[in-house]
Design a protein with these regions (language model features):
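Carrier-protein-dependent adenylate-forming modules in NRPS/ANL systems
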Residues: 1-142
């Protein structure tokens, strides 16, 4: 295996129904994680450049793990922002990352609004849909 995506793909093939991750509210199998990560990666691939940071404003959860893998599929790297950080610290991180967008879930949109972040918001829920294997393979080959 060469990277974390190869590991995920192989785990989904070998153990499709085995629980990959769980939190207090939900669990996800390897096959479900693989599919959701590819859906997220396919959607994000048209929104980010390869090597671009993708700030994530969410608590750690199964959804966050899906998003982490999806960002890697899209060719970016994820930066999990601590939701408890003060606004000035978060703005400094965003400036350092030179990112104009932030990904969150509908569940955290009000908390994000309170931080008054000057970024385009992408909702995790909007990233689910179809998988573009051609696009993902193209990114993986770079």
């Amino acid at each position: 295996m060469y990277n974390v995506l190869d590991y995920l793909k192989e785990s989904a093939r070998k153990y499709p129904d085995k629980v990959a991750f769980a939190d207090i509210d939900q669990s996800i199998t390897y096959e479900e994680l693989y599919r959701k990560a590819q859906e997220i990666g396919s959607a994000l691939a048209s929104k980010i450049s390869i090597g671009q940071p993708v700030p994530i404003f969410m608590e750690k959860s199964v959804d966050t793990i899906c998003l982490f893998f999806g960002v890697v599929y899209a060719g970016g790297f994820y930066v999990l922002l601590d939701m408890k950080q003060p606004q000035t610290r978060l703005n400094h991180i965003m400036k350092t990352l030179d990112s104009k967008m932030i990904v969150t879930s509908q569940k955290y949109i009000e908390a994000l609004k309170k931080k008054q972040m000057e970024s385009d918001v992408i909702l995790l829920e909007d990233l689910y849909g179809h998988v573009n294997l051609k696009k993902l393979d193209s990114i993986a080959s770079q």
